């Protein structure tokens, strides 16, 4: 128990009901006002001051042993003076509670009508003056009163907070069935201190703890996917058609099962005798004919007993559809309703999303709902597919379909992922080091040169599956005359140089550029030339410093820049005749 700071010198008790209970040394000592079971009110020599109570409640040997024991905690002293037998020891002179100013004390109301008058009823009489009859007086006469009668004093707040003493209030009450009764005088099932301290205004009434936060569909009704208490899921969507209107949707899972989804928003205009089906399942019909069950499913469709598509002349639906693998949001009311998507706009959403799609008009009656998600599979399987048995499918028409291209590399990598024996043989290829544009929206297999090349294929190196009738280069290359490079412009010469690496044409283009005063810098890897009309260059020995033209192959432009040219870093003109004779160039 915390320090209550209720100590004051003894004063005369004006209440005759309490004064009549005093015996022995307590007879002339009437205590009025706030009287607490603190030891500061007693003198140091309790037995000498009150001789009639020297052996009160225990033998002298027990009293002497009690004086030799160390000071008990406040909770222990309170238990000995309230719930246990009456113990009067010399250690009561210890001041457990600090001095409190008189102005802070509350005025005491009548003791006769307050809980103090009934103190003996719950203290269980018969233990040395604790009850109303007999016992020769005891600590009850010196019991300080904490509050007014019956807890009617509501102007002053409670002295203790139950959160600081959970064992005194609700926490103690929760364990009453499991914990044994610490005081044999307490009735079975009673709370030892809860009612006592509460009635005296010492603690606040325990408040019920709030439960943990839970979100229901009423809190966020506009959010799709809110879980209901019955296990269904809310979906926001609408099904509208000229021939009728109805709302339904189902949520497809990866295992092929479907879960009903509550349709919240259903809108549409009905013409003729078409009714409206709103519920877990339903759909629009052909007038009064095509109304059926099945709900709005992935890929669309509609008709009696099917997936609930649009009516005659009507467009299909917009809604939330959670599809298998990848959700296809948007459907159509195609003829027969067999997941055909003519003139429909579709959105991709993993696990379903919010979107809309419009389809062509047609009759949805007699349609058939397909749960194989064939339209989804086409969208999901957009790349090369490999099966466990080694079969490779879905190869693009422009891709080389042998083991030397990207298909062979992809097949080997995927096989190494499943076969532990091939892990050590798999290629540690860095995709970023192959010169591929990984951010490209187009397919990369057209310029993929292989895992052993650090740059993509050139335009003339791209291999295409062309008919053999067009492969005539090997037959006519020796019959063609040599190109006249002197008639070509400089940009075409640069194209021949950069696109025919390691070929005879590259040497011929380099020789022609050299004859046109272009020089190839072996360190800068660029072609440079002097700017016409500028003859002022700073010469330092054999080096020249000035502004030169250079050809930028990335931007394919001729730009100017200041260079310090060392003639030893410039490549010489290749000797074409020596190369033709098999000599070094």
Swiss-Prot record:
Record keyword Cytoplasm present: yes
A single BP term in Gene Ontology: regulation of DNA-templated transcription
Disordered, as annotated region: 42-93, 148-191, 349-394
Localization per record: Cytoplasm
A GO CC term assigned to this protein in UniProt: cytosol
Record keywords, A-Z: Cytoplasm, RNA-mediated gene silencing, Transcription, Transcription regulation, Translation regulation
Residue ranges with Gly residues bias: 349-367
Record field: compositional bias (Low complexity): 58-71
Tissue: Expressed in heterogeneous levels between adjacent germline stem cells (at protein level).
One Pfam family cited in the UniProt record for this chain: NOT2_3_5_C
InterPro entries given in the database record: CCR4-NOT_su2/3/5_C_sf, Not2/3/5, NOT2/3/5_C
Domain of life: Eukaryota
Biased composition (Polar residues): 42-56, 166-184, 372-388
Assembly with partners or alone: Component of the CCR4-NOT complex composed of at least Pop2/Caf1-55, Ccr4, Not1, Rga/Not2, and Not3.
PANTHER family: CCR4 NOT-RELATED (PTHR23326)
Function of the molecule: Component of the CCR4-NOT complex which is one of the major cellular mRNA deadenylases and is linked to various cellular processes including bulk mRNA degradation, miRNA-mediated repression, translational repression during translational initiation and general transcription regulation. Additional complex functions may be a consequence of its influence on mRNA expression. Essential for viability. Acts as a suppressor of position effect variegation (PEV) at the white locus and regulates the expression of several unrelated genes. Plays a role in germline stem cell differentiation in the ovaries.
Family the UniProt entry places it in: Belongs to the CNOT2/3/5 family.
Protein name: Regulator of gene activity
Name of encoding gene: Rga
